[in-house]
Each structure stands twice: as C-alpha cells, then as structure tokens.
Amino acid sequence: MINKSVIMDEAAIRRALTRIAHEIIERNKGVEDLIIVGIKTRGIYLAQRLVERIEMIENVKVPVGELDITFYRDDLQHKSEDAILQGSKLPDQITGKTVILVDDVLYTGRTVRAALDALIDNGRPRMIQLAVLVDRGHRELPIRPDFVGKNLPTARTEIVDVQLAEVDVMDIVSIRQLL
C-alpha cells in the first residue's frame, strides 16, 4: 500500500496560480515584452493557465510557448534511443524579451538547466525568470525560482506528484514515499 498525502487540491492550485500571475505582473511592472513558456509536459498547461489569468487581469494578450527539453537533458544516455523530439513551439522572437519559464516541480534544477540551454539556443532573452507550482528543495545546481506556488520541504525518498486536469483528469498535488 502506498502512503499518499494530498498537499494541494484544485482550489489551492487555482489560488497559487492566481497569486503567481499577480506576482509576475507586479515584478515586471506589467506585461510589456513578456513571454510565458511552459516546460513540457505539465509546465505547458500551467503556463497556459497563468496566461489566462494574466490576460484577465491586464486585458492584454500575452504570448505563450512550449519548450521541449528532451535532447538538452544531461541524463539523455539513460533514455531510450527511440526518444522522439516533439518540438518546441516558441513565439517568433524571444530575443530582448522577458521570458517566464514555467514548470510543475523544481527539484534538483537539472530540468531548468536543460530548459535554459534550449531557450538560449532559440534567442537571447533580456531576462529569464522561473515560476514553479512546487519547490521541493534538494538542488544540485545553483537555481532558484522567482515565483513559487508552494514551498514543500521533502525527503529524497519522497515523490511529489502533480496531476493536472488537462492530462490527468483532476488537479491535485500529492506526496508519496518512494518504495
């Protein structure tokens, strides 16, 4: 039997994303030259939700993109040789813009490092900021998020699961013990 604890329900996730949207607007003094980019897979859906909230608050269209970091990961040798690049979908021009990278969970920092490499290969943003739904600690690289939905100190033997309605039927963040 797996011992699983719910950390955030649908309402808590909604509130966290609304707060992050307000923080992004405040920190950047609006949304001019702002691009929101989600890291595949769940980061994409979180980015889309953030854009919806920001557009509702500011009444301005905000470009949103998708970043596939498959071939930028430093653990690629552990992946199947059949790994297929799904492709990034970025706005035409990221050079000179403020890019908000969005991911579901920040853990070691390796996913974000790969995302930074992938993003910079597509242009030279003026600034890159990081927004995550959950920061669980245990960094292996000097990476710190600018916007956090929930700080969740964990043991390395725990797994944080983020489920989003777009891919998992329901919105929930839970933690479970690694077997």
Swiss-Prot record:
Alphabetical keyword list: Glycosyltransferase, RNA-binding, Transcription, Transcription regulation, Transcription termination, Transferase
Ranges in a coiled coil: none
Annotated Gene3D superfamilies: 3.40.50.2020
Keyword flag Transport: no
Biological processes, Gene Ontology terms: DNA-templated transcription termination
Reaction(s) the record says it catalyses: UMP + diphosphate = 5-phospho-alpha-D-ribose 1-diphosphate + uracil
Matches recorded under InterPro entries: PRibTrfase_dom, PRTase-like, PyrR, PyrR_bifunctional
Record's keyword annotation contains Transferase: yes
EC number: 2.4.2.9
A single MF term (Gene Ontology): RNA binding
CDD domains registered for this protein in UniProt: PRTases_typeI (cd06223)
Motif (PRPP-binding): 99-111
NCBIfam families, per database record: PRK05205.1-1, PRK05205.1-3, PRK05205.1-4, PRK05205.1-5
Name assigned to this protein: Bifunctional protein PyrR
Organism: Brevibacillus brevis (strain 47 / JCM 6285 / NBRC 100599)
